[in-house]
Amino acid sequence: MATDVAVETTMGTFTLELYTNHAPKTCKNFATLADRGYYDSTVFHRIIKDFMIQGGDPTGTGRGGSSIYGEKFEDEIHPGLKHTGAGVLSMANAGPNTNGSQFFITLAPTPWLDGKHTIFGRVKKGMGVIRRMGMVPTDKEDRPATEVKIVKARVVREEDMEA
């Protein structure tokens, strides 16, 4: 059964489908952090038009965040998964095997990231929200001029879908 995570932001809600078969450890980390409320009230601290939006750092600086496995954990690079277009969900890192809690969502194809970042899902619903987030004006450090915040992120349970 697929795992989906609904992410409610100050700009709207989007749903992520996690690739649990291809990156089980990464998906478990993301889903567990979401259910614990770890991502609630965090900002998308880096937005680069036509490239990606990045969030998941509780410090909001791009230098923070930990995984459920400790500070960092290893990559789960799958050769069949590529950054082929907008809506690809990947782990942000500072080099090999430095995954924590930060993630990014692509706004366009980014093939130079293939093999360097763990792809662990995609935007299933709400790509318009992601595109609007990608248009937010930023400063010279790619920080949004207007705060874009995750209000709440949670795993979608089957009973939630029936309601």
Curated annotation (Swiss-Prot):
GO MF terms listed in the record are: peptidyl-prolyl cis-trans isomerase activity
What keyword terms does UniProt attach to this protein?
Answer: Isomerase, Rotamase
Q: Does the keyword Transcription regulation apply?
A: no
Any Pfam family: Pro_isomerase
Pinpoint the PPIase cyclophilin-type domain residues: 1-155
List the InterPro entries hit by this protein, alphabetically: Cyclophilin-like_dom_sf, Cyclophilin-type_PPIase, Cyclophilin-type_PPIase_CS, Cyclophilin-type_PPIase_dom, Cyclophilin_A-like
Give the SUPFAM superfamilies listed for this entry: Cyclophilin-like
Question: Which GO CC annotations does the UniProt entry carry?
Answer: catalytic step 2 spliceosome
- Give the enzyme's main class according to its UniProt record, as a single word: isomerase
Annotated GO biological processes are:
mRNA splicing, via spliceosome; protein folding
* Top-level taxonomic group: Eukaryota
Q: Gene3D superfamilies from the xrefs?
A: Cyclophilin-like
The EC number on file is 5.2.1.8
| Annotated catalysed reactions | [protein]-peptidylproline (omega=180) = [protein]-peptidylproline (omega=0)
Biological function: PPIases accelerate the folding of proteins. It catalyzes the cis-trans isomerization of proline imidic peptide bonds in oligopeptides.
Recorded family membership: Belongs to the cyclophilin-type PPIase family. PPIL1 subfamily.
Would you tell me the protein name for this molecule?
Peptidyl-prolyl cis-trans isomerase-like 1
Source organism per UniProt: Neurospora crassa (strain ATCC 24698 / 74-OR23-1A / CBS 708.71 / DSM 1257 / FGSC 987)
Q: Which gene underlies this protein?
A: ppi-1
